[in-house]
């Protein structure tokens, strides 16, 4: 399944049906009177969170959505049928923005949640509505009201309990594949991961959802590399696991590079709880490992965990540290179905 986390969509609710001008024409009824029915109401445009979705890819191929128009009224006091609503299905974690891409309209956080984005127009009154003691045979009726139309942006922020961050090639995808059933692409070159990945992790009988996003590089907040556009997917996480490559030139500088990008992004990431771990400890000599650990400790101002995603050493300890922060009620119950959905491809 292709991954798409942003889409521009045009929506229009249905116009109301027109009211009808009609009169009763029945035998033996000399003054039948008005009998024009009202028009039906136009259909609404509704956004609904669907279980099992984790991408907005459907909106790459169709961008225009229109609800049905209400039917016109008819004689014999027959009201027009209401137009059918149109329902757009989105993944949990989707946000709706106005066309300016800045004004937040709604934020979806629960499966089954619905939001009426555009209401259909009211149907017009038929001439029977205007009958009064002074106007026994009105010959006027109202047209239906037009529906609402607008362009909107759908933006997906995946919901996970914990998020993996780090420079490209820090071993995040290897870690995710080691602790979950997720099968991200793994290779020994930067930017192997091009899209966020989700995995369901079971640690000591506790399940939670872990998100892996493409690696950050210096200047990502200015658009360098893949930029910081994927950071929104870990903005909702309760805790970040920051992996630093022990084989890099300077672990402290590597940590600060990513930390600078997180702070530049701002939002909820600046004060997010962070667990720091030195990865690939199996690939360096003991003396070099001690130097890298000390460098990272000084930069992060905390003692880093030591692990090797490749061999599994230290991985359980890292998972237990995540579980301790996530607490007793992880959001994985909401996000698990999305994490277990069909994986994305590049």
From Swiss-Prot:
GO terms for biological process: ribosome biogenesis. It is an enzyme of class 3 (hydrolase). PROSITE patterns: G_OBG (PS51710), GTP1_OBG (PS00905), OBG (PS51883). GO terms for cellular component: cytoplasm. Its main location: cytoplasm. Residues 160-327 form the OBG-type G domain. Its cofactor is Mg(2+). GO terms for molecular function: GTP binding; GTPase activity; magnesium ion binding. Mg(2+) binds at residues 173, 193. Keywords: Cytoplasm, GTP-binding, Hydrolase, Magnesium, Metal-binding, Nucleotide-binding. Monomer. Belongs to the TRAFAC class OBG-HflX-like GTPase superfamily. OBG GTPase family. An essential GTPase which binds GTP, GDP and possibly (p)ppGpp with moderate affinity, with high nucleotide exchange rates and a fairly low GTP hydrolysis rate. Plays a role in control of the cell cycle, stress response, ribosome biogenesis and in those bacteria that undergo differentiation, in morphogenesis control. This is GTPase Obg.
